[in-house]
């Protein structure tokens, strides 16, 4: 259906009269590793309502779809599942392309798709290592900042573009939120700790306008991804944002922060959770449903390395090893019967009572966690 903004406002007003004025619900659920974030999202939705579930990667989407099938034996007819990039492109960019063209003084602009290459950086280095202005870089107030010479949108700048555009004095975000509120009863975002910079800013800006939004994530799994792992909201300039500071920022943005619903791990045993809490200083408790122990391998290291049933977790470069290995960051969310964690020099004295995390980077700690 094609609706003008005027008709859209009329329909929303009509819906408000019909349904009554509901208080806007904005909730963040902070979880621990293995607590079942995706399980919770998929089993707590009302399948009779119009749900929009967003996630960062295609792997996240696959897990969500699988969980929905397990929960309801089919994909709920009124529930939409999409990656965040796909959502931004199809819901915030394409429907408003005429407004985008007008905003940048190019009425009649028509794009030619999207590309995954990165836009030109603002500065580049010469052969001698000197940093200079990049002649190919376009400023943010120009449409060329967001599209290629072939009029393809840069996927990397979709959120930045959505935040930039206005029609007269009304932001694109406000218009999009009004449309989303009409077509969806609830918006849920999984693994929200993976979103950074403009993506994060866009989520917060939209959430302020949406009637019902739920974000689920684990603060201590931020900066674990191989990409998109720096900047807002977990860094201010070069300083890491603490757990309590992060909660405070969310509350100031208007969210109710829930730290109890998913505060126990279903995957990890009591002993493993206690070890993580004591050694890494990250509070995590267990449901106690799975057995498991922390075993230091000293004498039988070769036997463990040669056992294909035990996956070896290495900091990076898993493909270089002859045994079955996976990088710490890529193992996030997986469930296995046995894993051998191969430690780096930072954790050489992890078994000692005097071990301290004071000089270990947040990124390294989160990856081991």
Regions found by a protein language model. Name each.
Residues 1-369:
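The feature marks helicase ATPase cores and/or their adjacent C-terminal helical subdomains
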């Amino acid at each position: 259906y094609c609706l003008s903004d005027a008709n859209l406002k009329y329909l929303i007003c009509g819906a408000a009269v019909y349904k009554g004025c509901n208080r806007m619900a904005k909730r963040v659920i902070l979880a621990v590793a293995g607590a079942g974030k995706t399980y919770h999202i998929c089993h707590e939705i009302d399948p009779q309502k119009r749900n929009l579930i967003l996630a960062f990667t295609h792997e996240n989407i696959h897990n969500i779809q699988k969980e929905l099938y397990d929960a309801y034996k089919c994909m709920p007819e009124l529930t939409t599942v999409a990656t965040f990039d796909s959502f931004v492109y199809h819901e915030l960019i394409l429907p408003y392309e005429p407004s985008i063209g007008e905003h940048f003084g190019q009425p009649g602009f028509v794009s030619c798709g999207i590309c995954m290459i990165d836009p030109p950086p603002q500065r580049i280095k010469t052969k001698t290592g000197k940093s200079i202005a990049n002649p190919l870089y376009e400023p943010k107030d120009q449409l060329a900042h967001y599209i290629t010479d072939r009029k393809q949108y840069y996927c990397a700048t979709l959120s930045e573009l959505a935040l930039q555009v206005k029609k007269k004095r009304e932001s694109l975000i406000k218009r999009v939120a009004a449309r989303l509120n009409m077509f969806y009863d609830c918006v849920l975002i999984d693994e929200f700790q993976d979103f950074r910079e403009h993506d994060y800013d866009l989520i917060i800006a939209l959430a302020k306008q949406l009637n019902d939004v739920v974000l689920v994530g684990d603060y201590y799994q931020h900066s674990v991804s191989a990409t998109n792992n720096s900047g807002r909201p977990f860094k201010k300039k070069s300083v890491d944002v603490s757990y309590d500071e992060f909660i405070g920022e969310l509350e100031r943005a208007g969210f109710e922060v829930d730290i109890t619903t998913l505060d126990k791990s279903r995957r990890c045993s009591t002993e493993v959770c206690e070890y993580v809490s004591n050694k890494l200083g990250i509070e995590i408790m267990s449901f106690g449903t799975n057995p498991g122990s922390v075993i230091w391998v000293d004498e039988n290291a070769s036997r463990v390395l040669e056992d294909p049933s035990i996956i070896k977790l290495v900091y990076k470069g898993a493909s270089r090893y002859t045994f079955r290995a996976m990088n710490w960051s890529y193992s996030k969310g997986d469930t296995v019967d046995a894993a051998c964690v191969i430690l780096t020099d930072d954790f050489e004295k992890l078994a000692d009572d005097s071990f301290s995390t004071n000089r270990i980077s947040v990124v390294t700690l989160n990856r081991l966690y």
